[in-house]
Curated annotation (Swiss-Prot):
Function of the protein: Part of a membrane-bound complex that couples electron transfer with translocation of ions across the membrane.
InterPro entries per record: Ion_transpt_RnfA/RsxA, NqrDE/RnfAE, NqrDE/RnfAE_oxidrdctase
A Gene Ontology BP annotation from the UniProt entry: electron transport chain
Protein species of origin: Buchnera aphidicola subsp. Acyrthosiphon pisum (strain APS) (Acyrthosiphon pisum symbiotic bacterium)
Assembly, per entry: The complex is composed of six subunits: RnfA, RnfB, RnfC, RnfD, RnfE and RnfG.
UniProt protein name: Ion-translocating oxidoreductase complex subunit A
Annotated gene: rnfA
Length: 193
């Protein structure tokens, strides 16, 4: 159990996909203008990553490997992600129209989010078991959500601040992201896996 807890903490704080691996920057910068949108995007991304991780592991080990069709892994995975996102879009449209409108174009773009594409593939290439694959997907997506929500809170404060003209817009956003990244670097020596 200790292994899974360390695995969980490591993926959330130390090996964060946004701040360390620089994956998922498009939705991170685009959907983090307010806390509601960031939280909705985080929940949607977590759902898609978790379901995709589980389904890809099952498809890989029960269909692709036994039939020696490993070369179809990426195509199968794109299909799994597309179905997960489409299912999520239908559910959100019916249950939460406000969140559906807030997410706007970013909801279908989850399909091409490099974080969503990378996490299950990293899990497969690191030869995780089924349970490790679930933990990897959940912890990596929670790390994505944590950074996204923290950044959206800071970004809401930035809008209210008096920023010098040369730093308004993208410059202050990128400076803020770099400072958050430096903060998370403080966790680097915390866990050795």
């Amino acid at each position: 159990m200790k292994h899974y807890i360390l695995f969980f903490i490591s993926n959330i704080l130390i090996e964060n996909f946004i701040l360390v691996k620089f994956l998922g920057l498009c939705p991170f910068l685009g959907a983090s203008s307010n806390i509601e949108t960031a939280f909705g995007m985080s929940c949607a991304t977590t759902f898609v990553i978790l379901t995709s991780s589980v389904l890809l592991w099952c498809v890989n080990f029960f269909i692709l490997l036994p039939l020696d069709l490993i070369y179809l892994r990426i195509i199968a995975y794109m299909l799994i992600v597309s179905v997960s996102v489409q299912f999520l879009e239908i559910v959100l449209r019916k249950t939460s129209p406000i969140l559906y409108r807030l997410l706007g174009i970013f909801l279908p773009l989850i399909t091409t989010n490099c974080t969503v594409l990378a996490i299950p593939l990293f899990s497969l290439y690191e030869h995780h078991t089924f349970l490790e694959s679930i933990f990897y997907g959940l912890s990596a997506s929670l790390g994505f959500a944590l950074v996204m929500i923290i950044f959206s809170c800071i970004r809401e404060r930035i809008v209210l601040s008096d920023i010098p003209l040369p730093f308004q817009g993208a410059p202050i956003i990128l400076i803020t992201v770099s400072l958050i990244s430096i903060t998370f670097m403080g966790f680097k020596g915390l866990i050795k896996i």
